[in-house]
Every structure is written in C-alpha cells, then in structure tokens.
UniProtKB/Swiss-Prot annotation:
Protein name: Glycine--tRNA ligase
Annotated GO CC locations: cytoplasm
Keywords: Aminoacyl-tRNA synthetase, ATP-binding, Cytoplasm, Ligase, Nucleotide-binding, Protein biosynthesis
Subunit: Homodimer.
NCBIfam families membership: glyS_dimeric, PRK04173.1
Enzyme Commission number(s): 6.1.1.14
Gene: glyQS
Main subcellular location: cytoplasm
Lineage top rank: taxon: Bacteria
Pfam family, one: HGTP_anticodon
Catalytic reaction list: tRNA(Gly) + glycine + ATP = glycyl-tRNA(Gly) + AMP + diphosphate
GO biological process: glycyl-tRNA aminoacylation
Length: 462
C-alpha cells in the first residue's frame, strides 16, 4: 500500500508516544519550544553517539571539544555576527504581519512556479523583486509593504549585576567559533598535524523570525559540527571528501537514498568567505529542505580571530617548512533537524490484514530508542520474564510491558521502533526458551534464554 506521510501524522505520533512534547505546555506553551520525552531523548542521544563515533572516535584525523555557550563578546565581533548576522525583515502595512523577505519570496515563487533562488541577495535586490513580480503577503494577499530592514538573530543578555553595554553578552548562535578560538590550544596539546579536525556537539540559539515545521527550525537547537583544518590548496579535495562522508553516514543509518540530494550553492548564494558550499537536502513531507551544510570556509575564521585577538593562529608545517593559516572545511548538522529526518524516514504504514494497518518506525537498530521489549504472555509469568529484562537491561535499553494483549503490545513497540520483542510464554517455563520477534519482518524464532545475550550480540552495531 502507498503510505501518505504527513507532518500531522509524524507530530501526532511523536507527542502521543513520548518522543517530543510542546514546551511549557501546562502554561499554554511557548512558541517554537519543544521538550524531548523519554523516547525522544534516547533517539537524539543515539544519533549524537552515532555522529561522534564516526566523526570523532573512529576517525584518526579528528578530536573533540566542548566549549562554553557564553563567550567574550569580541568573539562575535571578529566572526562578523555582531555586524552581519541578520535576517531581512519586511512588514505588511495592511495586516500588520512581519515576514522574512527572502522566505516570503520563496513561498510566493513556489506557488507561482517561479524557479528563482534568492539566497545571498541584498535588501535592494529583494525589494526590487517584490515590486517587479507583485509578490503578495502570505497572510492577507496585500502588496503594501514597508522597506526591508536588518534584524540581528543573536540573543543578547547581561553578565553580572549591572545591565549596561559593558556587561552585554550573547548566547552563541553557532558552536563553530568555540572551535576556532581553541584551534591553537587543541593543536598544541594534542600535537596534531595538519590535516586534522575538531568536532563538537552543543546547544546554539538564534532568534529566528520564521521558525516552524515542528523541530525543523527552532530558536534553541543542538548542533553537531566539525571544523576540519587543511593546507590551502587541498581544501576542495577535502571538501569533496567530507561531502561524501556525510552523505554515506546518512545512508549507513538507513536513510533512503531517494529522499536525499546534494545541492551546490551558486556563486550568488555563497557566503563572502566561502570557496564552495553544498547542502545535503532531505525530502520532508512539506518538501525539500536543507539538512546538512558542508562549507569550504577558507582561512576566514582563523584570520579574523588572529586579527582581532592579535594572537598568531598560523601553523608551521614540518613537512614543507612552510607557515600558513589553515583552510577549514565545515560539515554542520543540526541534531534536532536530523532527528526529524529519522522520524520521517522511518515512519511506515503496513496493511497486515484487510483493513488492519500497522504503524511502524523502521529505525536502524543503532538509533532505536528502545532496543528490546520483554513481554510476558500472561501477568502470571511476570516474575520469570522480569529476570530476563533485568539481564538484558544491563547491556541494552529495554522496556518491560505486561499490560494488554500480546498483539497490542507488539503494535506499541512497532510504533516506537523497537527492533526486537522477547516473549516469555508458558512453554518457556519448561523448555527455557523465549520467542524473539523481528520488528520489520514480524518473523519469530525460539531462542534459549541462556543464549539470548549472544543472539543479540552485534545486532545493534553501527
């Protein structure tokens, strides 16, 4: 049967099964704020572990850091965020709504079959396009707009007891700058030679004007970023390497290839510091959206911080006896956005019998929130079944469930993506075997209790 995936179905399942809840819900919520429930936090943690394993732990080039969210404000002056990290805002004079001009144009283009990309356009270019094409307000259809103005996306706060300009500080809008300012520290203490990379997972904050589509774009989000430093002249070679590495990481975790594509940025779209940028995009239920940005940032960041801090951030290459400021390749992935990708991609509906639809999340076993569910056929068998649960939980994240019919319990586990169910029945009392059910095939096999641990060995590897 053809499965129609919708955001409504994904969001409903996520809320009802304990993946993601609306933030501050008992107080009426907070716009674009989401809390991860018991299953959601396990899913996201497993995704982060899978990223860290392949990008840092198992990669001989790379090491990790965990930098502070609050940094010296001069960091953001040097990086260009204070002066240039902003969105183009425009107001509709008729209905008094505020919009991001570039996103408003993109939405209008989509509805009117205009295949024009406006990334990187100046305010003047955006305004001219709105007037020439007759772009309308998405809320009321009006054409009477204010001029476009810039809105800085950084959250500003104050450090200490006084609230004045001297105590102004920002919540970081990206994790990357913490890596750049620690480049020399990491290189010196690890004695790494170029090429090498520094990975980090952490929270970032952006005061987005048009957040939305569930956890696709939020104001508080978690990033998984790698800054890979290389010799100038080798950057495009490494750029291609990391593009393919990132794409293959997604495929290795069972993301369907037909739902992925790479889109190279045009010259007009490129950031002023970028030599090349490619987005890995995913086909969400609401259409294609950016998932993973891979950018050749050249030596912009290290050079900026060297200039503003007056510190020497160059590298002496012992192989060539040459001193240079390394170029940097940055694969930047949002943990929340890729969690949404795994939810969307894993979601499936299957007609088991006529009119009987089974909803299943076909997660790769490595990222499944619950690995094994232990289910006694009857509550009378609970004591013996619970011993199996206690044995397995020392090694795997498991659930124990004795409530409801065995069929309903299987369906509950299918809906949360549990790869295996272990059923202890009345025969188990005598033959000391249990039934192991596979989520995807629904095939069942009898396994001796003493051999359960060896049976599951390697089934959740990545």
């Amino acid at each position: 049967m053809e499965v129609k995936k919708t955001m409504e179905k994904i969001v409903a399942l996520a809320k009802n099964r304990g993946f993601i809840y609306p933030g501050s819900e008992i107080y009426g919520g907070l716009a674009n704020s989401w809390d991860y429930g018991p299953l959601g936090v396990e899913l996201k943690n497993n995704i982060k572990k899978a990223w860290w394993k392949k990008f840092v732990q198992e990669n001989p080039y790379n090491v990790g850091v965990d930098c502070a969210i609050l940094m010296n404000p001069q960091v953001w002056v040097a990086s260009g965020h204070v002066g240039g990290f902003s969105d183009p805002l425009i107001d509709c004079k008729e209905c008094k709504t505020r919009h991001r001009a570039d996103k408003m144009i993109e939405e209008w283009n989509l509805k009117n079959n205009e295949n024009v990309k406006v990334d990187g356009w100046s305010n003047e270019m955006l305004m001219n396009y709105i007037r020439e094409k007759g772009v309308t307000c998405p809320e009321c259809g009006g054409k009477n707009f204010t001029d476009i103005r810039k809105f800085n996306l950084m959250f500003k706060t104050f450090q200490g007891v006084t609230e004045d300009s001297k105590s102004e500080i920002y919540l970081r809008p990206e994790t990357a700058q913490g890596i750049f300012v620690n480049f020399k520290n990491v290189q010196r203490t690890t004695r790494k030679k170029i090429p090498f990379g520094i990975g980090q997972i952490g929270k970032s904050f952006r005061n987005e004007i048009t957040p939305g589509n569930f956890i696709f774009r939020t104001r508080e989000f978690e990033q998984m970023e790698l800054e890979f430093f290389c010799e100038p002249g080798t950057d495009l070679e490494w750029f291609e390497y990391w593009k393919n590495f990132c794409f293959n990481w997604l495929l290795s975790l069972n993301i369907k290839k037909e739902n992925l594509r790479m889109r190279d940025h045009s010259k007009e779209e490129l950031s002023h510091y970028s030599n090349a940028t490619t987005d890995i995009e995913y086909l969400f239920p609401f259409g294609w959206g950016e998932l993973w940005g891979i950018a050749d940032r050249t030596d912009f960041d290290l050079r900026q911080h060297a200039e503003h801090s007056k510190e020497d951030l160059s590298y002496f290459d012992p192989n060539t006896n040459r001193k240079y400021i390394p170029y940097c390749i940055e694969p930047s992935l949002g943990a929340d956005r890729v969690a949404l990708v795994f939810l969307c991609d894993a979601y499936d509906e299957e007609e088991v019998e006529e009119g009987d639809i089974r909803v299943v999340l076909r997660f790769h076993p490595a990222i499944a929130p619950v690995k094994i569910a232990v289910l006694p056929l009857s509550k009378k068998l609970g004591d013996e079944a619970y011993k199996i649960y206690e044995m397995l939980i020392k090694k795997y994240n498991c659930e124990y469930d004795e409530t409801g019919s065995i069929g309903k319990r299987y369906r509950r586990q299918d809906e949360i993506g549990t790869p295996y169910c272990v059923t202890f029945d009345f025969d188990s009392l005598n033959d000391r075997c249990v039934t192991v059910r596979d989520r995807d095939s629904m095939q069942q096999v009898r396994i001796k209790i003493d051999e359960l641990l060896s049976y599951f060995e390697g089934k959740f590897d990545f």
